[in-house]
Amino acid sequence: MHYDGHVRFDLPPQGSVLARNVSTRSCPPRTSPAVDLEEEEEESSVDGKGDRKSTGLKLSKKKARRRHTDDPSKECFTLKFDLNVDIETEIVPAMKKKSLGEVLLPVFERKGIALGKVDIYLDQSNTPLSLTFEAYRFGGHYLRVKAPAKPGDEGKVEQGMKDSKSLSLPILRPAGTGPPALERVDAQSRRESLDILAPGRRRKNMSEFLGEASIPGQEPPTPSSCSLPSGSSGSTNTGDSWKNRAASRFSGFFSSGPSTSAFGREVDKMEQLEGKLHTYSLFGLPRLPRGLRFDHDSWEEEYDEDEDEDNACLRLEDSWRELIDGHEKLTRRQCHQQEAVWELLHTEASYIRKLRVIINLFLCCLLNLQESGLLCEVEAERLFSNIPEIAQLHRRLWASVMAPVLEKARRTRALLQPGDFLKGFKMFGSLFKPYIRYCMEEEGCMEYMRGLLRDNDLFRAYITWAEKHPQCQRLKLSDMLAKPHQRLTKYPLLLKSVLRKTEEPRAKEAVVAMIGSVERFIHHVNACMRQRQERQRLAAVVSRIDAYEVVESSSDEVDKLLKEFLHLDLTAPIPGASPEETRQLLLEGSLRMKEGKDSKMDVYCFLFTDLLLVTKAVKKAERTRVIRPPLLVDKIVCRELRDPGSFLLIYLNEFHSAVGAYTFQASGQALCRGWVDTIYNAQNQLQQLRAQEPPGSQQPLQSLEEEEDEQEEEEEEEEEEEEGEDSGTSAASSPTIMRKSSGSPDSQHCASDGSTETLAMVVVEPGDTLSSPEFDSGPFSSQSDETSLSTTASSATPTSELLPLGPVDGRSCSMDSAYGTLSPTSLQDFVAPGPMAELVPRAPESPRVPSPPPSPRLRRRTPVQLLSCPPHLLKSKSEASLLQLLAGAGTHGTPSAPSRSLSELCLAVPAPGIRTQGSPQEAGPSWDCRGAPSPGSGPGLVGCLAGEPAGSHRKRCGDLPSGASPRVQPEPPPGVSAQHRKLTLAQLYRIRTTLLLNSTLTASEV
């Protein structure tokens, strides 16, 4: 019975078990012609005992069930070829999430047709379809393949089909590059197809398909096969019966959304990338584009110009035996030494080639692709860091050190000498400075590369092509990026291998110096990386601290004024320690704090190197806010309490008085003990940091470059000393480099706190040595002097750079006459006194001004010029000892008493010849001073103050070199010993002023 107005379905007989129990999704696609619906209805009416009404009801029930199943006829579309060549019709599966081009590509390759040379039309439409549309929307439709409308193209297609070799025509890509996603389609035809298929114009040519819309859009299952052969001619009738039943699906096909266009652009970029990479494979790797300079440096031009020359320089013989004549006569140890040296040269050349592969294959290709508009989102510097700088430094190292060693061996046919490498490895710290940046950024480069490989299809295709290149030697990009730090850590191993096989003492010293230079640089790199990690950890902790709320404001005005100071900078340097030291997080955890008798709260504490933070967690967030002022670790007294799991923190101020007490309760006794021990360890660690860099004398670590410069100057001056010894000149007259000093107060002459003068007095006594009891327990044993010595000993400068002092060398200690004490650095600036010793007052110095923290870089002090020393030198005496000598109270064999203040000496020792009141003009010529020399008296001061006879003094004056006539000494007045000498008015005035100031200050202190 025929029912008009009902939707017609191709249903199996009602009695079929398959139709009742098996879903059509599990059945294979039907390729046989469909059975006429009227015959099925008649059979069903007979099986239903003639009850047509019940049959109709059954049909309506089946109709409801069929709405939720897939129609097998919508799983495929029919492809007909309207060409002059007879080609069999194909039934192609309409796959979901596949473009039309991707589905048709295997069919066209099998039939030998180039997909880009034909046009695809939908049923009776005259508008070519775009190959980027999704294929599943064409299910149940006819697609016709026609020759393009352009004149002359049809003949080309037919000629390609008739040619026996036409099977290779559609594969336009070279062999080995892999099939692309789909062939390039003419851009103009694609643009026209998009314009024709616009929503405003599609009804003009497709009106017959926009009729009934009774069946909603259904998604066909994805078949397993790529294409199905045509079964019989009945499939054409089946396709005709589908025509008007998929209007909704067909209308959805024309809605070209942004996803479709984005997919098309991605396909275009992939095709363009494959074409570029194929060009690089055929015609060679490109040069770095002139418009794109990596890191804005000029290394690329030099690199391009000298590449051929470098290739020639990097060519090595197969073995070191080809360089040396008579290698058969060498001992076994010499052969092993040559093997070790050759390994150093060979691995260096191989490493330079690896760096060149990274630059030429990966970096230059990437920059050329970016110039073409591909992979522009990739940051080359973030991916490769400063590898070009590393390649450049190794080229310089090879050209200046390695290549000359090889050329010398080739020219002389002699052994490879390890000492020839000393020139380059001695400057290892300054030459290899780019490695510091690369090692610190290497982890970030690796992470960035992994992210690109995971998310960027174009980058993944580019890296896959590059890693398959013959130059890469099957290495991954990650392996190539790890080469620099591996090479850096391999240098000490190679040099130690050379050292073990070397017997000559001079060569051993050179290799040891090279190993020391390399290891110092590696330690410096490790320290930089460790500090960087600590800064990152500290930054992570800082990000968790939300606010600083330790002060409660009483009004809005107070709140506004406080707002400027309510902050805490945990990244600031540790007070009293070196600026290079980074604050570390030692312990963190939750505690229960009790402040007072009743106040209890849950807190979260952070223990750093120098402070303890008490914070409170913010609700619904992993952040905290500071609720108590930071507690300095060195002012905390920690004690455990009898209550299990409790400990007390007493906070002291600068006067060592308690200003706060906090009781903390941990969750267990072990955790409580851990907090107490960690606080003690933090206090010890902070004390060590401040002991290494005491306040007021903080000296940053020397840079490697300055250290190497200092070593060079030291060697040059050693050579000058050797030359001076050969010519009979005393070694004491050659300049010696003292250790470097910063702008800190201890490295310079200590400034007095007033406009006072500092006398530099030298008193010479024969027989005194540096280890005299007065030096050990006298005025030189003050605490400030010990600090100066410890600072000198703990300096980073090598001990060989300190001024060597012999057993008879004297020292001149500067003393602040205003206080009668030695300056803190008086023992660091020892200069041997000249033969013309006299009282030399220093210029008045301005009061101290608080100086800013010392800069991280050290400044080199001007080399101290040493004067020739007399044969018998003695250490300096204090002013008190000098006055005793002036009073005639000492013989040159008796050690002087400990120093006393000048005021005490003036009261205890009567000196009738010295006046402390009145002006020098009033004193006149009768103002004498025992043992005080006249200006320019020269060694007479030494002899007279030590009680030496005047005759011996005259004898020594006769030993002066020619051309230096001694000054004529005035005859002493009658009745005065020859040991007495007169002082000039200026000298007497200075002594008087100094004595007055010292007496005044001493009296004020009492």
Swiss-Prot record:
Keyword Cytoplasm found: yes
Residue spans of biased composition, Basic and acidic residues class: 151-165, 183-194
Biased composition (Pro residues): 847-856
Domain of life: Eukaryota
PROSITE patterns noted in UniProt: DH_2 (PS50010), PH_DOMAIN (PS50003)
Residue(s) carrying Phosphoserine: S734, S851, S876, S881
GO cellular component: axon; cell-cell junction; cytoplasm; cytosol; endocytic vesicle; lamellipodium; perinuclear region of cytoplasm; plasma membrane
Compositionally biased intervals (Low complexity): 224-242, 786-803
Localization: Cytoplasm; Cytoplasm, Perinuclear region; Cell membrane; Cell junction
Record InterPro entries: DBL_dom_sf, DH_dom, PH-like_dom_sf, PH_domain, PKHG5/7, Ubiquitin-like_domsf
Domain PH: 584-684
Molecular function via GO: guanyl-nucleotide exchange factor activity
Compositionally skewed regions (Polar residues) per UniProt: 727-754, 769-785
Tissue specificity comment: Predominantly expressed in the peripheral nervous system and brain. Highest expression is observed in heart, lung, kidney, testis and moderate expression is present in spleen, pancreas, skeletal muscle, ovary and liver. Weakly expressed in glioblastoma (GBM) cell lines.
Classification via SUPFAM superfamilies: DBL homology domain (DH-domain), PH domain-like, Ubiquitin-like
Domain DH: 336-528
Modified residues (Phosphothreonine): T729
Extent of the signal sequence: none
Chain segments carrying region Disordered: 1-71, 148-198, 212-242, 690-754, 768-820, 837-863, 950-979
Positions with biased composition (Acidic residues): 36-45, 704-726
Protein task: Functions as a guanine exchange factor (GEF) for RAB26 and thus regulates autophagy of synaptic vesicles in axon terminal of motoneurons. Involved in the control of neuronal cell differentiation. Plays a role in angiogenesis through regulation of endothelial cells chemotaxis. Also affects the migration, adhesion, and matrix/bone degradation in macrophages and osteoclasts.
Oligomer and partners: Interacts with GIPC1/synectin and RHOA.
Connected disease: Neuronopathy, distal hereditary motor, autosomal recessive 4: A form of distal hereditary motor neuronopathy, a heterogeneous group of neuromuscular disorders caused by selective degeneration of motor neurons in the anterior horn of the spinal cord, without sensory deficit in the posterior horn. The overall clinical picture consists of a classical distal muscular atrophy syndrome in the legs without clinical sensory loss. The disease starts with weakness and wasting of distal muscles of the anterior tibial and peroneal compartments of the legs.
PANTHER family associated with the record: PLECKSTRIN HOMOLOGY DOMAIN-CONTAINING FAMILY G MEMBER 5, PLECKSTRIN HOMOLOGY DOMAIN-CONTAINING FAMILY G MEMBER 7
Name by which UniProt lists this protein: Pleckstrin homology domain-containing family G member 5
Organism: Homo sapiens (Human)
